[in-house]
A protein has these predicted regions:
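Gly/Ser/Thr-rich phosphate-binding loop
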Residues: 261-265, 277-365, 379, 387-389
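Conserved ATP-binding/catalytic segment of the ANL
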Residues: 369-379, 386-394, 398-459, 610
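Conserved AMP-binding/adenylation subdomain of ANL enzymes
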Residues: 193-210, 220-262, 277-282
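AMP-binding/adenylate-forming catalytic core of the ANL superfamily
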Residues: 120, 257, 264, 403, ...
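Regions immediately C-terminal to embedded phosphopantetheine-bearing carrier domains
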Residues: 566-694
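Conserved pre-ATP/AMP-binding loop-to-beta segment of ANL
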Residues: 23-26, 145-146, 153-174, 180-181, ...
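Conserved AMP-binding/adenylate-forming core of the ANL superfamily
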Residues: 24-82, 98-109, 158-163, 184-191
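AMP-binding/adenylate-forming catalytic domain of the ANL superfamily
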Residues: 8, 479-480, 487, 492, ...
């Protein structure tokens, strides 16, 4: 491991040094998702692949040009990212659209238009679908593809190491901004090194640690915390794809157990998912006693999620003191504050009514989880957003951060950069847009100044959702739709309020409008609104200048003062009464799987998966169960494109008729008591990371 006197100035220098000093040591292990073997890369292997991709890039691009990365999570993604760093090309992490539908392509098209990449790095399998997108791009932005899986490793000899300095931009992280107006955070090589130092210190990473990750590589937490941190610190890393985890959450815990994972984590929903989905029969064969840093971030941390997880997995020897809270955002590279290893996450009970008025008083009603302390060489303030006054302890204000991890603004967006990255007292401060307070140096996050919604760790922007409703539901008045966060049964979800004209109210049933709104949002974002309010004309709260007041809309909905004439879930979505036809065995079998996963009593042929309460996590689990039970090749994309029971069953029937078998699932090897690791096993632990989300609560 490198000490303070050996710190590299770039991640390129870090990997090159390891490739020279310990070339055969395992750098990464990717777990196989079928009956094939996983992929392991030594430092020599990764360096060779990075140099070959860099050489190919240098033949087509100049220092500072951009390259978009479009891969599933896996070895190609990693090699391509380092290839960009090696070439001095600015990497733009992204992900292939979930389907060919317009909604799923919009974000990628917006990123391409904003970043103006010289190349798109991908694999041969994705070449044709990506080339079809050129019809939606201008000639200047037409995709030029480089399939990295077809490169000859010998081209690495042509690599010419560029003069990359710490202030040069390493990559653009598109994690903030709406679909229509994306904002690419400019993260420099120096930012990366500074933040990796913080993560190593904060987590207390040592030579005996093993990092296990399922987080997406296109997301800052998965990329910087899951992939780059183990390479920077020289510790083993085990990676699996997010899909592999979501299909069966127990796989995450099995990997920690099998490979001796000590550092791993994810958003709050990952812990809830394990509590809900892992069978009791699995608890005794999983050993989580070595898991020392179970970090939680990327969305609000809920005490009940942690308590349920700790209670259930006590049988697997999980220690609740391993929970570790972290807060951060892409504009600060990733990590801003964190707890203390082995100390758990302190909770603070406060008066709910006082908190709603941004005051802190101990009492009942709300429980806030401590997000740790600021890190060395970095500073934090709580500031009154209106006056700019710095606030003392127990005063709620906007969280500001400063230090060498703070990014270099937004790509070619001076206006947004000036609003978010401000000068004060001779240094640059990041206005996070999050609300919180300090108590004895510890940070508590209470909410957001921004209107952004965070659902299952993913950022959803209200402007995007509002545009979707307005374009797909003509009866909703243009400019009179508001999307906002709601909390139902302890989980954050989407709320929609839409003004409906008097004439439409008379001619179109309220239930039909509600169903149309929920279906439009569900198909675009794989998450149906938990609340829909149909409003009378003029009822939507606005400022004197005509701007939507989304927070006021939510508050009025909560206190009952919103002028609505129909409300979901006061109205329930209409479901057809008849069950699937008895003579259609396939429809019935798939219907039973839907009912079990969605927790509904019945499902009809034309019922829509996402309107029944499904989301992207449930979709992954349904696809996996159908694939395994019927032995058919099936992909998540096929449920997104055919979201009704009837349409999805027809898709499955076509796959069966074509005789496309599923890849055989990985054989499960029974394990008894876990044995101590030998020296060879410890070397084997040189492993990896993987898989989704953005700005607010990393």
């Amino acid at each position: 491991m490198m000490d303070a006197f050996e710190l590299p100035t770039t991640l390129v220098q870090a990997l090159r040094r390891r490739a020279v000093q310990e070339p055969e040591r395992l750098a990464l292990r990717f777990l196989a998702e079928d009956d094939g073997e996983g992929v392991v890369l030594s430092y020599r292997d990764l360096d060779l692949r990075a140099r070959s991709i860099a050489a190919a890039l240098q033949a087509h691009a100049q220092l500072g040009d951009r390259a978009v990365l479009l891969f599933p999570s896996g070895p190609d993604y990693v090699a391509a990212f380092f290839g960009c760093l090696y070439a001095g090309v600015i990497a733009v992490p992204a992900y292939p659209p979930e389907s060919a539908r317009r909604h799923h392509q919009e974000r990628l098209l917006s990123i391409i238009a904003d970043a103006e990449p010289r190349l798109v790095l991908t694999t041969a399998d994705l070449r044709e679908p990506l080339l079809q997108m050129n019809a939606q791009l201008s000639a200047a932005n037409a995709l030029q593809l480089l399939c990295v899986d077809q490169l000859d490793p010998a081209v690495a000899e042509a690599w010419d190491e560029p003069q990359v300095r710490p202030e040069h931009i390493a990559f653009l992280q598109y994690t903030s901004g709406s679909t229509a107006l994306p904002k690419g955070v400019q993260v420099s090589h120096g930012n990366l090194v500074a933040n990796e130092v913080l993560i190593r210190r904060g987590f207390g990473i040592g030579a005996d640690d093993v990092i296990v990750s399922w987080l997406p590589l296109y997301h800052d937490m998965g990329l910087i915390g899951g992939l780059l941190q183990p390479i920077f610190s020289g510790v083993p890393c085990v990676l699996m794809s997010p899909r592999y985890f979501l299909e069966r959450p127990v796989r995450w815990l099995e990997a920690i157990s099998q490979y001796g994972g000590t550092v791993s984590g994810g958003p709050d929903f990952a812990y809830r998912l394990c509590s809900e989905r892992v069978a009791e029969s699995a608890l005794q064969r999983i050993d989580l006693s070595g898991w020392r840093v179970a970090f939680s971030g990327s969305e609000p941390i809920r005490q009940d999620s942690l308590e349920r997880f700790a209670e259930k997995f006590a049988a697997s020897r999980f220690d609740a003191s391993s929970f570790f809270a972290c807060y951060g955002l892409a504009e600060a590279t990733l990590f801003v504050t964190g707890g203390q290893r082995g100390q758990g996450i302190p909770a603070l009970a406060v008066d709910g009514e006082a908190l709603a008025r941004n005051r802190i008083a101990e009492g009942e009603g709300s429980v806030l989880m401590c997000c740790g302390r600021r890190q060395p060489e970095h500073a934090g303030l709580i500031v009154d957003a209106a006056s700019g006054e710095v606030l003392g302890d127990d005063n709620v204000g906007e969280i500001w951060a400063a230090g060498p991890s703070i990014a270099h603004g937004y790509w070619r967006n001076l206006e947004a950069s000036a609003k978010t990255f401000v000068e004060r007292d001779g240094r640059t401060w990041l206005r996070t847009g999050d609300l919180g307070f300090l108590r004895d140096g510890e940070l508590f996050v209470t909410g957001r100044l921004k209107d952004m919604l965070i659902v299952r760790g993913h950022n959803l922007y209200p402007q995007d959702i509002e545009r979707t409703v307005e374009s797909e539901v003509p009866s909703a008045r243009k400019g009179r739709v508001a999307a906002f966060a709601v909390t139902v049964d302890g989980e954050e979800g989407i709320g929609i309020a839409a003004e409906i004209g008097r004439g439409v109210q008379k001619s179109v049933p309220a239930q039909e409008l509600i169903d149309s709104i929920r279906q439009a949002v569900a198909e675009a974002y794989q998450e149906a609104p938990k609340v829909v309010a149909l409003l009378n004309p003029g009822a939507l709260p606005k400022t004197s200048s005509g701007k939507l007041q989304r927070s006021a809309c939510r508050l009025r909905l909560e206190d009952g003062s919103l002028d609505s004439y129909a409300l979901f879930p006061g109205l329930q979505a209409v479901q057809e009464a008849q069950p699937p036809a008895g003579d259609d065995e396939l429809l019935a079998r798939i219907g039973e799987i839907w009912k079990a996963r969605l927790g509904v009593a019945q499902v009809a042929p034309r019922d829509h998966f996402f309107l029944l309460g499904g989301n992207s996590i449930g979709a992954a689990q349904v696809v996996a169960q159908v694939r395994d039970s019927l032995g058919v090749a099936l992909d998540l994309r096929q449920l997104f494109e055919a979201p009704t029971l009837q349409a999805f069953s027809a898709t499955v029937a076509r796959q069966l008729a074509a005789g496309l078998p599923a890849e055989a699932p990985m054989a499960h090897l029974p394990r008894g008591v876990d044995l101590p690791q030998s020296a060879a096993q410890q070397r084997l632990w040189l492993t990896w990371q993987i898989d989704p989300q953005s700005a607010a609560y990393n």
